[in-house]
Curated annotation (Swiss-Prot):
InterPro entries in the record: CemA (IPR004282)
Molecular function terms, GO-annotated: antiporter activity; proton transmembrane transporter activity
Name used for this protein in its record: Potassium/proton antiporter CemA
Family of the protein in this entry: Belongs to the CemA family.
Stretches that traverse the bilayer: 7-27, 106-126, 145-165, 181-201
GO cellular component term, pick one: chloroplast inner membrane
Source taxon at top rank: Eukaryota
Pfam families: CemA (PF03040)
Membrane topology: Multi-pass membrane protein
Species annotation: Sorghum bicolor
Length: 230
């Protein structure tokens, strides 16, 4: 009976692992043209966030300062009045094109993420039996290991997620989420998240080790603490 359910469960696991990349690749190609046509024919100021307006304004000011500096170096005040507006106008058009492409990528990534999340949620809901089988496999594999290897894997996972060097990984993760969703970067939120979330996660892991794992295998907890304190 287990062998009959092994293949569907394995295929389900492969499907779950490859789903984000498959959805991202296929829907990006399919939605890109449609979103581009929709955006170019129905632009709206509601999609222009404060950070995007600030970025365009900063780019405009930077261009103006560069043109002024260039003309001051050349020491041609007569041509400054004529060339400066023309050059800035061309650069503003280029900035508008770049900003338009940024809008398209934000909408495309957001749409793809929503579709991927919906498909993934549906897969979890429809694949409850496969998830139960996969969970039993993981538990069986873990419980069949000796206590030393179990302690090693637990220590590896805890150090990976809440270790000394994990803060950089969490910061990169939240920055990737913000960039992927098109949100304005907020250093305060990044700092609060990096300082608080690993601590909360570390507390939960310690609670699991002391209260849950200690009931299942006290010797494993002793080995775990011996390795972590070494």
């Amino acid at each position: 009976m287990k062998k009959k359910k092994a293949l569907p469960s394995f295929l389900y696991l492969v499907f779950i692992v490859l789903l984000p990349w498959g959805v991202s690749f296929s829907f990006n190609k399919c939605l890109e043209l449609w979103i581009k046509n929709w955006w170019n024919t129905r632009q709206s100021e509601t999609f222009l966030t404060d950070i995007q307006e600030k970025r365009i304004l900063e780019g405009f000011i930077e261009l103006e300062e560069l043109f002024l500096l260039d003309e001051m170096i050349k020491e041609k005040p007569k041509t400054h009045v004529q060339k400066l507006p023309i050059g800035i106008h061309k650069e503003i058009i280029q900035l508008a094109k770049i900003d338009n492409e940024d809008h398209l990528h934000i909408i495309l990534h957001f749409s793809t993420n929503i579709i991927c999340l919906a498909i993934l949620s549906g897969s979890f809901f429809l694949g409850k039996e496969e998830l139960v089988i996969l969970n039993s496999w993981v538990q069986e594999f873990f419980y069949n290991l000796n206590d030393s290897i179990k302690a090693f894997f637990i220590l590896l996972v805890t150090d990976f997620f809440v270790g000394f060097h994990s803060t950089r990984g969490w910061e990169l993760l939240i920055r990737w989420v913000y960039n992927n969703l098109g949100w304005a970067p907020n250093e305060l939120i990044f700092t609060i998240f990096v300082c608080s979330f690993p601590v909360i996660l570390d507390t939960c892991l310690k609670f699991w080790v002391f209260f849950c794992l200690n009931r299942l295998s006290p010797s494993l907890v002793v080995i775990y603490h011996s390795i972590s304190e070494a």
